[in-house]
UniProtKB/Swiss-Prot annotation:
This is Transcription activator of gluconeogenesis ERT1. Residues 7-20, 78-90 have a biased composition (Low complexity). Transcription factor which regulates nonfermentable carbon utilization. Activator of gluconeogenetic genes. SMART domains: GAL4. Belongs to the ERT1/acuK family. InterPro entries: ERT1_acuK_gluconeogen_tf (IPR050335), PAS (IPR000014), PAS-like_dom_sf (IPR035965), PAS_13 (IPR056751), Zn2-C6_fun-type_DNA-bd_sf (IPR036864), Zn2Cys6_DnaBD (IPR001138). Residues 439-513 form the PAS domain. CDD domains: GAL4 (cd00067), PAS (cd00130). Residues 34-62 bind DNA. One of its GO terms (biological process) is cellular response to starvation. Pfam families: PAS_13, Zn_clus. It comes from Candida dubliniensis (strain CD36 / ATCC MYA-646 / CBS 7987 / NCPF 3949 / NRRL Y-17841). The gene is ERT1.
Amino acid sequence: MNIEQENITNTTLTNTNNVNDKPKPKRKKTSRACNHCHKAHMTCDPGRPCQRCIQRGLGSTCEDAPRKRKKYLEDVPNSSLMSSHSINSSDHLDSNGVTPMQSTLSLPMPPVQESPFSTSAPTQSQVPAYTPSTVPQRQPSYSPQVASNYSPNHKTYSATLFQHSATSPELMQTVPEYFPELHNQHYQPSANPNQKRRTNFLSTAADLEYSTLSNILQENFGHHTTSNEGTPNSHNFSPALSPHNMPTTDTNAPPPSIQLASNDQRQVTSFNNHTKHSTPSPLNTSQTKLYEDARYPKCDETINQYFLGDTESGKMVVFPDVLTAIENMKNNDPAVYVERNSKSTLSFAMSISHESNSNNGKDGQLFKEPEEIYEKVKKPFSYTPGYHSLIAYLRKRFTKPMLVKMAESMATYRPSFIACTNSLKEHDLIFMEQCFQRTLLTYDNYIKISGTPTIVWRRTGEVAYVGNEFCVLTGWPKEELIGKDKRKFIVELLDDKSVLQYFQVFSRIAFGDFLGATMTECTLLTPNPNVKIRTGCMWTLKRDVFGIPMMIVGNFLPIL
C-alpha cells in the first residue's frame, strides 16, 4: 500500500514539473527600446507606451531612447531626421493582409474612395495605401529613389531621375494625375531664397564635384569683386545669371543657377535620342515652342539644359556664346527667359569627342607613348626665350606701376631658378624635359576623364597642354593656344587683376610651399573682348626630381 502511494505521489510531482517546464513565449525584440527599458537594459516592445512601462506606471514618460548620432549627422537638425518608429509603422500590413505597394514612398496619397480606378472599399487606416487594384496598368512603378527626387526637401544630389525618368511622358502625365498635391508642391517655387536647390546633372560624379566646389567658392569668395581693368566695355556674365540679378517680372520664379556637367559623347547622344522620340505631355505642348527658336542655342526643354561642345552639324558650341545668347534673351525676350528658368534651374551638358592619347611636345611633335618621349627628346628645353617673350608681352600690355609690382614678385623666385639650374649638366636638363613630357602624358589620361576645364603651363607661364573642356569654357581654340610655332602664356588668358595675383601666388609657392596647391579666384578672358568669365581656380604645382617647379596644373570652374 505504501508503494502504491509513493508511485501516485511521484506521478503527481512529475506532472507538476512538466506543467512548470513549458517555455514561456519569448518577447519579441524591437529595433529601438524606450528610454526606461534602455536604461535598465531590459527587453522592450515596439508599442508606446510599452508593456513594461505600463506595468510600472511609467507610461506617460515612455518614449524612444535617443541614439548616438553618426559623425556625418552631427550638423543635421532633429526635424530633418525621421525616427525609426515612424519608419516601422509605415511597414505594417493592411487589414486584408496585403502589403501596400511601395508604401515607404512618403508621398501625399489621395483618399482611396476618390480614385476612379478603386474597386475595393476604403480601409480604416489613417494613411490610405494603393493596392494593385487601385493603380491602373499604365501607371509606372514608383520606387523610393524616384519619389525622393520629387520631394522638395530632398537634399541628395542624384542624377538617376534626370537620366531615365525626366523625359518620360508617361511619368510627367501620371504624377499630376494621381498625385496632384505632390505635383503642385514640386512645381511650386520656393519662397525661401536660402533653400538649397537641387542640381540637374547627367553624371553623379560631376554632380558631387561641381556642387561641392560651388559651395566652397560661394562661401570663400562671395565678397570678392571682379576686375574689369583693361577692357572698360567688358561685362561679366556670371553675376548676371546669379540669384541676385533675377528680373522682377515674376516674383515667384526660382532663381536660376548655372551648372556645368561633363559627359561622354555616348551618354549625351543616348539622352538626346530618348528626348527626341518622347512625346511631350498635353500640359507642356504650349511651352514646347519656346525652345524651338533658332535665335537661341539648343536647349533640352524638359530640364532647361543647354548643350555645349560638339554638335551634330560639326559646330563647336562654347560657353561664352551661350552666355551671350542668354543675356540677349534676358534683354529682348524677358518672357521667354522667365518661362525657361521658372521650370527648372539652368544647367549645361557637355559632349566632347576626344582624340587619341597625345600631348604636344616641343616644336609641335606628338607623343603618344612613353617610348617616343625617351627616343625623341634629345635636347633640353630652353626657358630663356620664354622669359624674354613674357617680359615683352607684359611691357606691351601693362602700365609701369603694375610692371613694378610684377617685377617685385618675379625677383623673389627667378634668381633661385638660375642658381638651381647652373649646377645641372646637359643630361640633367634633358632628363628634366623627359620627365615633364612623361608627366604630361600621365596627366592627359586623367584630364580627359575628369570633365573639369584644365590647362597646364610651364614655370615661365607658357601653355603646354589644354583640355577640351577648357576650350569649351573659354571659347579659345586649341590650335591658338598650343599650335605649332605658337607661344601662348597663361597671363594672356587672365584679366589685369588676376595677372597680378598670379605672380604673387606663384612667388609664394615656387620654393616656399612644397605642397604646391592653392585655390584662388581669377577672371578668364575670351576671344570676345566683351565677355569675361569669373572662375575659381585650383593650382597644383608639380616639381621635378631636383625640387624645381616643373609645371602648374590649373583647374577652372565658373563661379555662379
